Swiss-Prot record:
Its EC number is 6.3.5.-. This is Aspartyl/glutamyl-tRNA(Asn/Gln) amidotransferase subunit B. SUPFAM superfamilies: GatB/YqeY motif (SSF89095), Glutamine synthetase/guanido kinase (SSF55931). It is an enzyme of class 6 (ligase). Heterotrimer of A, B and C subunits. It catalyses: L-glutamyl-tRNA(Gln) + L-glutamine + ATP + H2O = L-glutaminyl-tRNA(Gln) + L-glutamate + ADP + phosphate + H(+); L-aspartyl-tRNA(Asn) + L-glutamine + ATP + H2O = L-asparaginyl-tRNA(Asn) + L-glutamate + ADP + phosphate + 2 H(+). Belongs to the GatB/GatE family. GatB subfamily. Gene3D superfamilies: 1.10.10.410, GatB domain, N-terminal subdomain. GO terms for biological process: glutaminyl-tRNAGln biosynthesis via transamidation; translation. GO terms for molecular function: asparaginyl-tRNA synthase (glutamine-hydrolyzing) activity; ATP binding; glutaminyl-tRNA synthase (glutamine-hydrolyzing) activity. Keywords: ATP-binding, Ligase, Nucleotide-binding, Protein biosynthesis. It comes from Thermosipho africanus (strain TCF52B). It holds the Pfam family GatB_N.
């Protein structure tokens, strides 16, 4: 391929702390009334002093460790100075010179995407426009609730080789965030926000375009689409011999294009300097170690364990570990059923027909004991697998036990050999031509007789018993 994209991501993760980064206001503000979770600190009133959140640091360290970063014992906050209506202080408290962590990576499909740094900072407020398109808005309102909500900003190296890989990186990162419990990772709620930097290399001339920043992408799909569009735009400009401007562009959902927003800022535009109201935060290696020891099992580790301990295929383990809730519920069921493979089959073929991997499995009406009872009914021959699927659906919807459902619906397998034989004898008498054809070698007609019994018993006959009796009566 002549033209190759070079992509790096800047990802802002809202941390699930109880309070904001530097004050005691609640951090979970998504559903609150506008401007109801604010105080003199997060709105930048004169004389109000910030105090860093310990929980913010703990969550940041867990995230940095999960992303294989070197965690720095010495960190310091700085002021990033710029004007925007949703930034009441006129500056943002961030970590520019001495970040929390450096030099990490996230492994994706066997390839390492390097992480340059992770730093802690505070969020800005939120502008609410009178129109979905800012260019068409007649007015804008400011909600300061989000001011001071703690963020971890993750900056990757430009190692991402395609828009699809960028999407996959974000999906895997969100999975890790949710396993750690440090963030919901909900893009639609602003808990995970991504800006992308893209340039394009012409491999024939070894010429590389200027870097373009792309913003306003509020879903993984839109990140991929925006980068696909921008790659084509830059590539076409290079083919035409035009210079690609170094700028910030925004994804326009209505036109499925990017539009120019402003020229790209440089670091010196922000006039960074040390935050005078917060002393440096110095952590000992022992303190960092104690926090890292709280690390839960991560998705890749859990997947490997499922394959090893439960003898699952990579495909099965991938799906069952796609969310922590699903993986935990699977293990709860295996503990009761003592049958990992059968439990996996029912999760993949039945449970996930009704639930997504991100569901709250603690709230399901179907419980681990129901899986065991269902498997026992199948293994004892009281119900067939087809009937079991019907039973499963009813248990899932109502929370009744499988035995109750079987009794109420009267769908226990008919294992009475004399009844099955009676039905088959009548069929043989009514279909002498098919009996003769079968005896002359058309063995596929066995299915006709077995199917007839199943139809008359409404699927309740034991197929194994039906097969045996049919073959005996047909002379096999």
């Amino acid at each position: 391929m002549r033209f190759k994209p070079v992509i790096g991501l800047e990802i802002h993760v809202q941390l699930n702390t109880k309070t904001k980064a530097f004050c005691s206001c609640p951090a979970d503000v998504f559903e609150l009334e506008p401007n109801s979770a604010i105080c003199p600190v997060c709105t930048g009133q004169p004389g109000a002093l910030p105090v860093p959140s310990k929980e913010m640091y703990e969550y940041g360290i867990l995230l940095a460790s999960a992303l294989n970063c070197r965690i720095n014992e010495y960190t310091r906050f700085d002021r990033k100075n710029y004007f925007y209506p949703d930034l009441p202080k006129g500056y943002q408290i961030t970590q520019y010179f001495y970040p929390l962590a450096n030099d990490g990576y996230l492994e994706l499909d066997g390839e390492k995407i390097r992480i340059n740094r992770i730093h802690l900072e505070e969020d800005a407020g939120k502008l609410v426009h009178s129109s979905e398109m800012i260019t068409e808005a007649e007015s804008s309102l400011v909600d300061m609730n989000r001011c001071g909500v703690p963020l971890a900003e993750i900056v990757t190296e430009p190692d991402i080789k395609s828009p699809e890989q960028a999407r996959k990186f974000l999906e895997k990162l969100r999975q890790i965030l949710r396993y750690l419990g440090v963030s919901t990772g909900d893009m639609e709620k602003g808990a995970l926000r991504c800006d992308a930097n893209i340039s394009v290399i012409d491999t024939e001339t070894n010429r590389q375009s200027n870097k373009v920043e792309v913003k306003n992408m509020n879903s993984f799909k839109f990140v991929e689409k925006a980068l696909e569009f921008e790659f084509e735009r830059i590539k076409n400009a290079m083919l035409e011999g035009k210079d690609v401007e170094k700028e910030t562009r925004g994804w326009d959902l209505s036109t499925k294009t990017t539009i120019s927003m402003r020229s790209k800022e440089e670091a010196n535009d922000y006039r960074y300097f040390p935050e005078p109201d917060i002393p440096p935060v110095v952590l000992s290696s022992d303190e960092i170690k104690k926090i890292v020891e709280k690390m839960p099992e991560l998705p890749d580790q859990k997947k490997e364990r499922f394959m090893k301990d439960y003898n699952l295929s990579e495909y099965e383990a991938n799906i069952l570990t796609s969310s922590k809730g699903l993986a935990d519920f699977y293990e709860e069921c295996v503990e009761v059923t003592n049958d990992p493979k059968e439990t996996s089959n029912w999760f993949l073929t039945e449970l996930l027909k009704y639930e997504s991997a991100e569901s709250n499995f603690e709230e399901l009406k179907i419980k681990p004991i129901h899986f065991k009872e269902l498997f026992d009914l199948i293994s004892s021959g009281k119900i067939t697998r087809n009937i079991a699927k019907e039973v499963f659906e009813e248990v899932y919807k109502t929370g009744k036990s499988p035995k109750e459902v079987v009794k109420e619906k009267n769908i226990e397998v008919v294992g009475d050999a004399s009844l099955i034989e009676e039905i088959l004898k009548k069929m043989l008498e009514e279909n002498p031509d098919k009996v003769e054809a079968y005896r002359n070698g058309k063995k596929g007609l066995l299915g006709f007789f077995v199917g007839g019994v199943m139809k008359q018993t409404k699927g309740k006959a034991d197929p194994k018993v039906v097969n045996e009796i049919a073959k005996k009566l047909l002379g096999d």
